[in-house]
Regions:
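Non-heme Fe(II)-dependent double-stranded beta-helix
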Residues: 1-13, 19-118, 123-126, 164, ...
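Double-stranded beta-helix
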Residues: 8, 142-205
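Conserved hydrophobic/aromatic beta-strand scaffold that supports enzyme active sites
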Residues: 15-17, 134-138, 151, 187-189, ...
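Feature marks short, surface-exposed loop/turn motifs that line or immediately flank catalytic pockets
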Residues: 26, 109, 143, 158, ...
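Non-heme Fe(II)/2-oxoglutarate
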Residues: 40, 52, 197, 204-289
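Short, surface-exposed loop/helix-turn segments at secondary-structure junctions
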Residues: 51, 120-121, 173-184, 216, ...
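Generic beta-strand structural signal
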Residues: 96-103, 114-116, 131-137, 147, ...
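Short, conserved beta-strand element in jelly-roll/cupin
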Residues: 119, 126-144, 191-192, 199, ...
Length: 289
């Protein structure tokens, strides 16, 4: 798993890349799922509970933004999410007892796949402590031209920013006046060959540029928490596996830390679509290089 130097880098930066960590056997299985889901999407004219489609999606030219609640959409995706290859790596950072939280597969389609503005994850699903991270794996080689995940080192140790606009609407993005306070010149593009894993602290500020290359950038994202980190508010996109213990033992006590951020909307009452919808309908800020 991770050596001490890698662990220290994660805790210092708020993120870590592990190049080529997922091998060919799993990548082939995951690619088979992607191919099947693209074919399935051709029958749709608009987004549904499984697929978030781009406005120009068609049967002839599919354009999928996201496979929602990925572990519920194919058995292979749940098998991967609980594989020791995955959960043992996460345990190196969060401890031996782990709970599954949520899952999505972002496609970032070729020739203009959406940019995502600077944001932090924890505001959408605050927990009783910050022992929560995202495990992302690039299914294909991903370089700067594909719009890789990009993070601002050290921001996980700073402010939990407000992600509502002045009208009180959830934007899923750090507002412009707060972006102006960030050292965006320190941004690191998290690139790597197929199978590269990106681990993101729940507080680190990150985003991604648009993909103007001729290849899509499929990225499977699973969120895990330490078993003693419990959600404070309803989960925006709960799966049938949300809250399932995937490693170790159930805790006897909850771990509590102060949460200084603003609480998100009541997703169980207002509904949740995605970060793409939130940033678009709330006048998404331009990508900041």
């Amino acid at each position: 798993m991770l050596d001490q130097r890698a662990r220290e880098q994660y805790f210092a930066d708020g993120f870590l890349t592990v190049p080529g960590y997922v091998g060919t056997a799993w990548l082939d299985r995951l690619h088979a799922v992607v191919t099947a889901k693209i074919e399935e999407s051709r029958a749709l004219a608009e987004s549904d509970d499984q697929f978030e489609l781009a406005p120009d999606h068609s049967a002839e030219k599919p354009n999928i933004r996201r496979l929602r609640k990925a572990v519920d959409q194919h058995p292979e995706l749940w098998a991967f999410a609980q594989d020791p290859l995955v959960v043992d790596l996460v345990a190196d950072l969060l401890g031996p007892d782990l709970r599954f939280h949520s899952s999505k597969l972002n496609f970032k389609w070729s020739d203009g796949g959406d940019a995502v503005g600077w944001h932090q994850d924890i505001q959408a699903w605050p927990h009783t402590n910050f022992g929560v991270l995202t495990f992302g794996v690039y299914l294909d080689d991903t370089g700067p031209e594909q719009g890789p995940l990009t993070a601002l080192p050290g921001t996980h140790r700073g402010t939990i920013f407000d992600q509502f606009n002045d009208d009180g609407r959830w934007t899923g993005a750090v507002v412009a006046r707060d972006v102006a306070t960030l050292r965006t010149d320190t941004a690191r593009e998290l690139c790597g060959p197929a199978g590269t894993v990106v681990l993101l602290d729940c507080r680190v500020v990150h985003g991604s540029a648009a993909n103007f290359s001729p290849r899509m950038r499929p990225l499977l994202l699973n969120v895990y928490s330490a078993a003693d980190a419990l959600p404070i508010t309803p989960t925006p996109a709960p799966t049938t596996k949300t809250g399932v213990l995937v490693r170790g033992q159930e805790p006897t006590h909850v771990h509590m830390e102060p949460y200084p951020g603003r609480l998100p909307p009541r997703w169980d009452q207002v509904g949740y679509r995605s970060i793409f919808a939130a940033q678009t309908t709330a006048a998404r800020p331009a990508w900041v290089d």
